[in-house]
Amino acid sequence: ESRGAPFTVLFEGPADEALARRIVERLESAYWRVGGALTAYPAKPISVVLYTTEQFRDVTRLPEWTAAAYDGRIRMPVRGALEQIDRLDRVLCHEFVHAVVAMLGGRNVPTWLNEGLASVFEAKDTADAERLLARTSARPTLQELHGSFFGPPAGDAAIAYALSTRAVQRMIDLRGAPAVVQLLQDLARGGDFAAAFQQRISMRYEDFQSMVARQ
């Protein structure tokens, strides 16, 4: 258990305390970086379940292309994780952002906003997302991405993540991260998404969707 930022590490499989310490250190880095940008920090400890064997996919039932999951706990496979430190940092940051979104927005946050925010903060920039979008003209609307991404095949899901990344980056460019936080808080109070979006981003949701689709 970390004595700094609120993380508790559990194991599914053989325990590895040295690995747990390294992962908590990297989570704490994400905690301060993301928390500082959003001025929001989880008040309750976050449990992190590390799958040290091949049990991760059996337990979470996620598609093969997923790297980890957040369902109230951060869950991730860790075999060989320290051999890919950059990727480990990105995955941990991504899932930590999901924990922050859950705290701020509750259950009413569209998937594209949740995943887009996590993707923006995990990466140094959005260049990879833009390169992927430049190679395809078949893109879903943001309205179509309010639900789970787990239905499409991996290629379609990659486009969904890229479009979500672009959309959230545009929101931040337009009104800043605090406006996104306020939108999440509106949703936690049960606010209508389109109305809350227009109030916080100062743009109709329909117009924003068109802007994101044509860029």
Q: Which stretches of residues belong to each language-model region?
A:
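Juxtacatalytic substrate-recognition/specificity segment
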Residues: 2-110, 124-129, 139, 146-150, ...
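Glycine-centered structural positions embedded in regular secondary structure
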Residues: 67-69, 116, 164
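Generic structural signal for hydrophobic core residues of well-folded globular domains
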Residues: 100, 104, 121-124, 171-175, ...
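Active-site cradle of extracellular carbohydrate-active enzymes
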Residues: 114-122
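Scaffold signal of the M16-like zinc-metallopeptidase fold and its non-catalytic homologs
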Residues: 134-137
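Pan-zinc metallopeptidase signature
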Residues: 142-215
